[in-house]
Amino acid sequence: AENLSQVSLELGGKSPVVVFDDADQENALNGITAGIFGASGQSCIAGSRLYLQSSIYDEFLKKLISKAEKIKLGGPMEKDTQMGPLNSFKQLENIEKNIKATIEQGGKIRCGGKRSSVSNKGYYFPATIIECKNHNLPVAENELFGPILSVMKFDKEDEVINKMNDNKYGLSSGVYTS
């Protein structure tokens, strides 16, 4: 093997994150927000599927929505910008198509969900959180490469492990617990 070449692969991801009821919630909120909304969700390891234990679901989701709604969308050269545009119109259309299909199948937009008019010089989409009763809805199942977080409820550890592993894009995952 005289000519072994180094290779760097860009792999697909639909990374799950789970928060158990004993987790440090502030730490989890900060990590989840940075993980999905950092780089406008355009990372193969963005934590785009969130599983919350039932006992903390409502309170945690309310705090997460509040954080997401405060994210400043804008141009990359503006000092107060916290999240910039998507990389292409094709990507924007794919996100919108998946959100529409998810809503038609019972998903519920909790914040964001529609393209932004912040500028006509880019493809802007706000931080978006969608509640999914089923972890196989389009925004929870398909790689979107955008600031779209699907949120689902679970009761027991074995249940959430099965759901986390039930996706073809298994690249990384995150667990918040004590």
Annotated model-derived regions:
Residues 1-134, 157-158:
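ALDH superfamily catalytic-core signature
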Residues 18, 72-73, 117, 124-178:
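Conserved C-terminal structural/oligomerization subdomain of aldehyde/semialdehyde dehydrogenase
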